[in-house]
Amino acid sequence: MKRAKQSLLAAGMGAALSVTLLAQGIPYDKIEIKTEKVAPNLYMLSGSENVDPGHPDGAGGRIGVLAGPDGIFMVDSQYLQIGDKVLAAVKKIDPGPIRFLANTHLHGDHTAGNATFAKLGAVLIAREELREGMARPPARGGADTRDPARLPVLTYGMGDPVRFRMNGEIVELIPVRAAHTGGDTMIRFVNADVIMVGDFYRNFGYPFIDTNNGGSLKGALEALEVTMKVAGPNTRLIPGHGSYVNRTDLIPYRDMILAVRDKVQELIGQGKTVEEVLAAKVTAPFDSKVPGGLLPANTGGGTTADRFVRMVYSELKAGK
């Protein structure tokens, strides 16, 4: 898609800048919130490009806002430090009450701002696994571990989608098995034909499978398959980082993961160590095709090839 390519080009140009920013931390005061209308009453909020060293394509995670007479439903909450900016952007869309906020996964760039909205009366909704992860220290994204307001109060597990109706929209919270983390959810707006997929798909850098928080390669592949089945030919998919894609964009992404997995498995079968597998450059056929794929191993701005290969090796070596 043209929009996605333009955004990724900008992100690539900012990768060098991200190396410097990585050492300095995130300059939250420089982050501005951009609002984009996705459907008549559905909006996407995103942070400034080339400010967040971990996400040069846009600071923090993407936020969804469903607005209307029934109140506001939000998807994710960004960093705690920019909660006031996010709130101002939401209120500019609609001054009504923020009734619900659902989290796609537990990382701080998606959940650290939860307390800002919970204290205004929003009911926090998420997977039980996500709540359990957030309750364990350390807190993420600047959130205070001692502040219970940041934790979801309405939780669900793996199973059928949680479905509700609001503002003329049918919203589905679709749980997926351990993928990016152990408590991922994709959120579908049926009438708008939009799905917010969280971080098990990203269009900058290689996949990030957070095994420390329950993520798995097998689950990430399954989540991609589920998304391709649920999405229609015209469905707009909003990743946690990056611009819109559609289901056909997921195919080369999935195929790349499968190819790397199979090559790493082959080398493990030959008795290769992780360092030997890294030296084999198994991602070489994809490095120039994956935006950010040529970033060196010590660079911020997305998951590098070496980081991804280490994740794959670790999971396959463990026989998972």
Task: Show the residue positions of the predicted features.
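Accessory terminal helices/loops
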Residues: 21-25, 29, 229, 243-320
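Acidic/histidine-rich helix-loop elements
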Residues: 46-61, 134-144, 204-217
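Metallo-beta-lactamase
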Residues: 71-73, 77-81, 163, 170, ...
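Divalent metal-coordination and catalytic microenvironments
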Residues: 41, 66, 76, 90, ...
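Bacterial N-terminal signal peptides
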Residues: 10-20
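Conserved beta-strand hairpin/beta-sheet module of binuclear metal-dependent hydrolase folds
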Residues: 37-90, 185-189, 193-197
